[in-house]
Amino acid sequence: MAKLIHTMIRVLDLDKSLRFYETAFDLHISHRLDFADFSLVYLRNEQADNEIELTWNKSRTEPYTHGDGYGHVAFCVDNVAQAHQRMRDLGFNPADVREFHDGASQLLARYFFVQDPDGYKIEVLERHGHYQ
């Protein structure tokens, strides 16, 4: 059976991205491969079964475009209101907290979005129902 192990994103400023993911989501380097032209840095925390791979092409000077295919990466937290306030306090400018309901009034998700230094959208969901 196949197992999802990582998702890769390209970053323009590796140090800035590392600071963001460590500060925002408590992700730390689990493995790093440095080559002459590029580096691969894998991030995870104690709760994660998979990793985010940051690929840094050292000669790149222009920001990456995300096209119209990329959606977002998602993290779940115990309390989305507290996480939202923390992101605001850190200056990460999160979007407003929203709720998603079924056709009636049952809460399906409580969430907000924030962007990393390269503009990748990240959804932060409160642990609830499907989102554990």
What is each of the regions a protein language model found here?
Residues 2, 8-51, 105:
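Core segments of cupin and vicinal oxygen chelate
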Residues 35-36, 100-102, 128:
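Conserved beta-strand edge residues that scaffold enzyme active sites
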Residues 46-50, 59-61, 78-82:
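Short, charged/polar surface micro-motifs in flexible loops or helix N-caps
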Residues 11-14, 65-121, 132:
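Vicinal oxygen chelate
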Residues 43-47, 114-117, 127:
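Active-site beta-strand termini and strand-to-loop segments that position acidic
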